[in-house]
Regions:
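Transmembrane beta-barrel strands of outer-membrane/channel proteins
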Residues: 31-39, 74-78, 108-110, 160-164, ...
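Residues on the lipid-exposed face of transmembrane beta-strands in outer-membrane beta-barrel proteins
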Residues: 57-63, 94-99, 147-151, 203-207, ...
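Surface-exposed beta-loop-beta
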Residues: 177-273
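Detector for outer-membrane/organellar transmembrane beta-barrel domains
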Residues: 253-338
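Outer membrane beta-barrel
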Residues: 68-176, 210, 370
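Repeated loop/turn-to-beta-strand initiation elements of outer-membrane beta-barrel proteins
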Residues: 29, 67-72, 103-106, 155-158, ...
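Outer-membrane beta-barrel translocator/channel fold
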Residues: 36-48, 83-87, 107-142, 293-316, ...
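Residues that define the transmembrane beta-barrel architecture of outer-membrane proteins
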Residues: 49-57, 88-93, 141-145, 152, ...
Length: 378
């Protein structure tokens, strides 16, 4: 089975700064709108279209109290998709109040938190749910209701989270692409009797030791990665409870950047996951302003072919080009190869640049190749 996606888009952004009548408040309004098109090289196995166009709107409202430390950010999101009703959806990416005093920071509302250092996968990144209809690589996330306290001390930084509500993963509908047959049901199952109202907790400690940045994290609550159960002729996502311990390490040694993410997760199954590797940067290629990063990573999951994610015994190799021009042109390309099955691999290309101060273009291309029926990508 082979699938290829090419996705191109334009981004229009504008910013307006407004000062309220009261001198102690400042308001900033900005936002973006983008036109996106996905093109597949072949029709879907269930007859889905080869093309898929959509519009995205993402305004941003920022408020800051100039005579105090309070600030509030509100970022709503909406996508209209011409083909897939399930991909047409809205979300509150952020509605977060921040205040700080001394060594302490308090955030409350809806927010996004990213943990991770590696390129090919982010094992330790467990706070936010994946907005799976948005991107193939799982980088897009839904906003997460939270209370987040940060304590910054000389001995390190600690982050404490209370997560009072769970967000279900989004999935493509019947007319959408990159889905199983039948489509995944919107009727989710939960291990906890509290379902989406289960209160989750998370903690992270981080500190710089010279050129090495080390983080240790713990999460207890509803697993963001669903299992799948066949019920009544439907594939239903099943959200189990889990505990996870994670560690992420990133260190700079000359032009080398070494990375590690390692987790142990206790959920419906118990497993260990590892992503580790390096990125070497060739600065000023042939006396030019262009920098090239050479990336290599190894991915391991102790569940083998029973893993719910890609990368149980795989290697990733890639190149990152930074052209260092005034348009901020960047290109990333890479390939992940399954070491157990030579016919299982996927490749990606990401490229972006500014047209002017208001317009930006971006292209994402993905190739999936698989002839092994028991592999997740099949």
């Amino acid at each position: 089975m082979k699938k290829t996606i090419v996705k191109g888009g334009q981004l229009l952004a504008s910013t307006l700064l407004v000062t309220a009548a009261l001198p102690c408040f400042g308001i900033e309004l900005s936002g973006s709108a983008s036109l996106e098109h996905r093109q597949f090289f072949s029709s879907g196995l269930q007859g889905q279209d080869r093309g898929q166009s959509s519009l995205v709107f993402e305004p941003e409202f920022y408020w800051q109290q100039s005579e105090g430390n309070g600030r509030f950010t509100f970022i709503p999101f909406y996508r209209w998709d011409a083909v897939d009703e399930e991909r047409s959806h809205g979300d509150i990416r952020e509605a977060l109040y921040l205040n700080y005093w001394g060594d302490y920071e308090l955030r409350a509302g809806v927010g996004k938190v990213f943990w991770g250092v590696t390129e090919s996968a982010h094992l330790v990144d467990v706070i936010n749910q994946t907005d799976a209809v948005e991107s193939v690589d799982g980088e897009a996330k839904l906003g997460q209701p939270m209370v987040h306290v940060t304590v910054v001390k000389e001995w390190g930084t600690t982050d404490w989270f209370v997560l009072p509500y769970f967000r279900e993963r989004t999935f493509s509908g019947e007319e959408g692409r990159l889905r199983p047959n039948p489509p995944i049901s919107q009727d989710a199952l939960y291990q906890s009797s509290q379902a989406e109202k289960h209160i989750d907790f998370a903690f992270r400690y981080s500190k710089m030791f010279g050129d090495w940045d080390i983080g240790v994290s713990y999460f207890k609550g509803t697993n963001r990665d669903p299992y799948y159960r066949l019920s009544g002729g439907e594939i239903k996502p099943y959200y189990a409870q889990m505990s996870q311990v994670g560690i992420d390490i990133q260190g700079i040694v000359g032009d080398w950047l070494w990375k590690l993410e390692n987790i142990y997760r206790d959920s419906d199954d118990h497993h260990t996951g590892v992503v580790t590797g390096f990125e070497y940067t060739w600065v000023g290629v042939l006396d030019s302003v262009v920098d090239i990063g050479f990336i290599a990573e190894y991915l391991y999951d102790s569940r083998g072919n029973n893993a719910q994610t890609i990368g149980q015994n795989d290697v990733f190799a890639g190149l990152r080009f930074a052209f260092n021009d005034e348009d901020g042109t960047e290109v990333l390309m890479g390939m992940t190869q399954d070491l157990d099955n030579i016919d299982v691999y996927n490749a990606k290309l990401e490229a972006s640049s500014r047209i002017n101060n208001q317009l930006k273009w971006r292209i994402d291309a993905w190739l999936f190749e698989n002839e092994t029926a028991n592999d997740l990508l099949y």
